[in-house]
A protein has these predicted regions:
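Short low-complexity stretches enriched in small and charged residues
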Residues: 22-30, 51-53, 71-73, 88-100
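Core catalytic region of metal-dependent phosphoesterases/phosphodiesterases
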Residues: 1-64
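Short acidic/glycine-rich loop or secondary-structure boundary segments that cap or lie
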Residues: 9-12, 45-48, 70, 78-81, ...
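Residue-level detection of beta-strand-connecting loop/turn positions
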Residues: 65-66, 111
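Solvent-exposed, flexible loop/coil residues
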Residues: 59-60, 66, 125, 154
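Short, surface-exposed, charge-dense and proline/glycine-enriched linear segments
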Residues: 28, 32-36, 67-78, 128-133
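Conserved beta-sheet core of the metallophosphoesterase superfamily
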Residues: 75-153
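Active-site neighborhood of phospho(di)ester-bond hydrolases with catalytic His/Asp-centered motifs
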Residues: 1-5, 35-41, 70-73, 94-100, ...
């Protein structure tokens, strides 16, 4: 699951020296059958033209065990502005998964809900590592690019 801003991260951040969107799109296009993506605030129809998998969905909903995961970029829906999953609130025991802030997070909110953020592979913020998050068999792991695990959360 890619949480948006796939090829570009907007004008507020300097381009990293390693910025190579053509290499990123080639790598991702090769893996298109295994990717689910949501649109970030910097993703455009022009980006979609060069990618061979859909990236413009505003959100994705899927299950992890008994938990419903609402995955979105985070610039529209977040813990301050919850997504419209049920009248008045998100469902009991749901997970709100988003990027946007580039800061890893694993925080409870509401009644039995979780907010999770994988951080950022390309432009981490607040002193966090270049990293990502995996989900296997009900276990979330936050990892550095070298593969080291720095946080684990079991559902």
């Amino acid at each position: 699951m890619l949480l948006g801003d796939i090829l570009y991260h907007g004008p507020r951040n300097d381009l990293p020296d390693e910025y190579a969107p053509k290499q990123v799109l080639a790598m991702l296009n090769e893996r298109r059958e295994r990717l689910f993506c949501v649109r970030g605030n910097c993703d455009t129809e022009v980006d979609q033209m060069v990618l061979t998998f859909p990236i413009l969905a505003d959100y994705s909903i899927f299950l992890a065990g008994s938990r419903l995961i609402y995955a979105t970029h985070g610039h529209v829906y977040n813990t301050a502005h919850l997504p419209p999953l049920c009248p008045g609130a998100i469902l009991l025991r749901d997970i709100l998964l988003h990027g946007h802030t580039h800061v890893p997070a694993w925080e409870p909110f509401g009644e039995n809900n979780l907010y999770l953020n994988p951080g950022s592979v390309s432009i981490p913020k607040n002193g966090s590592a270049h990293g990502y998050m995996t989900l296997e068999d009900g276990v979330f792991e936050w990892k550095t690019l070298s593969g080291g695990v720095y946080h684990t959360l079991t559902l």
